[in-house]
């Protein structure tokens, strides 16, 4: 009987991708099969995120909940950014943990487990071997018509509030040809939509073959677009400072680039943006969006917002709200600022009461919600092309898929439509999802 691994993933799409790779590595090396039931696992892994407040405490809380499973010989590992940040301190606080590994050393997981068994003591490897891990990863096991592809690692921006450069290292781009080979391999397995991943994905600068030539992100997008079978291209997360004119122009040339962009602004006050060390102004950010919407008028935008950064005044907050009104976001991810240990912003004086921060956050989220509802309502009666992902979460007898703009659409349809692109007439709209009916021609094609 095969061994089973349970992986709990926290945080961003990069972590989701890394968790998939952990599963692939363990399957190729040791025959592990994934399980969603922690009680039947032989190996339990926590792929952690250190971006939010009290991330470490959440990890130790989860570890405490599975500690009793050690009695039947279960192995426990901690990976991801908290592992990179805390290292051996995790073992000191939770000595029942068997392995601790960082985002750049997940490919060494089978070796770490073997060494743990051989030496009978916990193993820690949180080094930064740059892009080495991609040379040791087995081919991806595809599930569904969508897939993530990591094209670069790390971040060199050093925003004053962010731990990512310290936990994932500096920016390193994968070789251009390696990315194309991976995408082509996914297309051969039936993948129709790829999401290119990186902490600052549009900062990609990949070496091209044996030449000294470097491919920028726009060039990579063009080549990915030419791969047969790939019908949609997404990417996250992009940085406003890396949004070059060539990338903007790509939206005119490449119809496979979806009509959705996640471009985190974080704030709308130039004073706060400077304190965050973001490197752009609110006007420069909006200028980029104006250029994009001149090419794609219906481009759906999403963003990240931090409320209550140290020193934020009511005027600063109002400037953020004006930016939100000016742009019109399809969705957003918004949080109250929480200091991350070791970052420059953690040393800043913060005298804004929590109640004020909470009020501002609630106001921001209510404003975004109003925008989302209005945009959803505007979709009524339109025809949206969706990629069918599988059974609906609301009703397992129905199907769900996503529009180019990343809106969920639920509809009645045959299971044979899963993995296909179909046109849907939108008949109902709620804040978070749409409902529709399959056009007759798509039903006939699949009959």
Curated annotation (Swiss-Prot):
Pfam name, any one: UPF0004
Domain MTTase N-terminal intervals: 3-118
Needed co-factor(s): [4Fe-4S] cluster
Top-level taxon in the UniProt lineage: Bacteria
Cellular location(s): Cytoplasm
Bound cofactor: record note: Binds 2 [4Fe-4S] clusters. One cluster is coordinated with 3 cysteines and an exchangeable S-adenosyl-L-methionine.
Binding-site residues, [4Fe-4S] cluster 2: 155, 159, 162
UniProt catalytic activity: N(6)-dimethylallyladenosine(37) in tRNA + (sulfur carrier)-SH + AH2 + 2 S-adenosyl-L-methionine = 2-methylsulfanyl-N(6)-dimethylallyladenosine(37) in tRNA + (sulfur carrier)-H + 5'-deoxyadenosine + L-methionine + A + S-adenosyl-L-homocysteine + 2 H(+)
Enzyme Commission numbers on file: 2.8.4.3
Major location (coarse): cytoplasm
Entry keyword set: 4Fe-4S, Cytoplasm, Iron, Iron-sulfur, Metal-binding, S-adenosyl-L-methionine, Transferase, tRNA processing
GO molecular function list: 4 iron, 4 sulfur cluster binding; metal ion binding; N6-isopentenyladenosine methylthiotransferase activity
The TRAM domain, residue ranges: 377-440
Gene Ontology CC entries for this record: cytosol
Domain Radical SAM core: 141-374
Residues that hold [4Fe-4S] cluster 1 according to the record: 12, 49, 81
NCBIfam families given in the database record: miaB-methiolase, MiaB/RimO family radical SAM methylthiotransferase
Recorded family membership: Belongs to the methylthiotransferase family. MiaB subfamily.
Functional note: Catalyzes the methylthiolation of N6-(dimethylallyl)adenosine (i(6)A), leading to the formation of 2-methylthio-N6-(dimethylallyl)adenosine (ms(2)i(6)A) at position 37 in tRNAs that read codons beginning with uridine.
Subunit architecture: Monomer.
Protein known as: tRNA-2-methylthio-N(6)-dimethylallyladenosine synthase
Organism of provenance: Polaromonas sp. (strain JS666 / ATCC BAA-500)
Phylogenetic classification of the source organism: Bacteria, Pseudomonadati, Pseudomonadota, Betaproteobacteria, Burkholderiales
